[in-house]
Swiss-Prot record:
EC nos: 6.3.2.6
One example GO MF annotation: ATP binding
Record PANTHER family: PHOSPHORIBOSYLAMINOIMIDAZOLE-SUCCINOCARBOXAMIDE SYNTHASE
Catalytic activity: 5-amino-1-(5-phospho-D-ribosyl)imidazole-4-carboxylate + L-aspartate + ATP = (2S)-2-[5-amino-1-(5-phospho-beta-D-ribosyl)imidazole-4-carboxamido]succinate + ADP + phosphate + 2 H(+)
Family note: Belongs to the SAICAR synthetase family.
Source organism of the structure: Salinispora tropica (strain ATCC BAA-916 / DSM 44818 / JCM 13857 / NBRC 105044 / CNB-440)
The protein's enzyme class: ligase
Name recorded for this polypeptide: Phosphoribosylaminoimidazole-succinocarboxamide synthase
Involved pathway(s): Purine metabolism; IMP biosynthesis via de novo pathway; 5-amino-1-(5-phospho-D-ribosyl)imidazole-4-carboxamide from 5-amino-1-(5-phospho-D-ribosyl)imidazole-4-carboxylate: step 1/2
């Protein structure tokens, strides 16, 4: 296998006509990779992605060829995939006002060019899910919000509309399935690319704790920060630590590592109904 790309969290290898996508235990916050891994994180993300790819297979095609035809040393954290020509846009759907979207709303009253009702509080449910794309920045740089018009300028009107529709369809169906299991999906990011036949196809990961914000429905209360089954716990620690959000990042304390892993395990078990390990 030939290493093609090493990203913040995933490594991509070429294996003949296919790709081998490997999820590491690395964790990134504020677009910087932290020096401390989260044990089994890569396997948890891979298992949850595969579950979602299966759940949403009739809604949108995905890049998975096999989860078992991979090198034995990578079993559980690698997927054999078809090659895609990736779209140069991060496709994000939001159902709740949180994170960077809430910060932008506080400053301007809009999110990615979409005007929202006045007086909304942190974590408020949006009137309907919205498409809030961003640029794809290199490792170490920050993604920047885009308006839909900017996406049109980058990829054309027809493709931009398809990106928006697929992203929102995936979010709505994912949110519906998660709600049945007591989980709210606040927002999610998906990667889309063109397959060899020109079909827009989901790649990378899907609806995981790295690409989404998951909240327990039973404790949801707008107007405050939510308990989150994702890397928000690490983000919060990084914010409190006094780190300037530039490399090199500090080591993550053991208690933060353990609590983060527990959240990844909990949401996997709640969503899939399967025991981890």
């Amino acid at each position: 296998m030939e290493l093609l790309h090493s990203g913040k969290v995933r490594d991509v290898y070429a294996d003949g006509d296919d790709l081998i996508l490997v999820a590491s235990d690395r964790v990134s916050v504020y677009d910087v990779v932290l020096p401390t891994p989260i044990p089994e994180k890569g396997k948890l993300l891979t298992a949850l992605s595969l579950w979602w790819f299966d759940q949403l297979a009739e809604l949108v095609p995905n890049h998975v060829l096999s989860a078992t035809d991979v090198p034995v040393e990578l079993a559980g954290r690698a997927i054999r995939c078809r090659r895609l020509e990736m779209v140069p846009v991060e496709c994000v759907a939001r159902g709740y006002l949180v994170g960077g979207g809430f910060a932008e709303y506080q400053r301007t009253g809009v999110v990615s060019g979409i005007e929202l009702p006045r007086g909304m509080v942190e974590a408020a449910a949006l009137p309907e899910p919205i498409f809030t794309p961003s640029t794809k920045a290199p490792v170490g740089e920050h993604d920047q919000p885009m308006t839909f018009g900017e996406v049109v300028d980058k990829v054309g009107a027809e493709t931009a509309e398809r990106l928006r529709q697929i992203t929102l369809d995936v979010y709505r169906r994912g949110a519906e399935l998660a709600a049945d299991r007591g989980i709210l999906i606040a927002d999610t990011k998906i990667e889309l690319g063109w397959a060899a036949d020109g079909t827009l196809t989901v790649g990378d990961e899907l609806l995981t704790s790295d690409s989404s914000r998951f909240w327990p429905a039973e404790s949801y209360q707008p107007g405050r920060a939510q308990f989150s089954y994702d890397k928000q716990y690490v983000r919060d620690w990084a914010t409190r630590s006094g780190w300037d959000r530039r490399s090199p990042a500090p080591e993550v304390p053991d208690e933060v590592v353990d609590a983060t892993r527990a959240r990844y395990v909990d949401v996997y078990e709640r969503l899939t109904g399967e025991r981890w390990g």
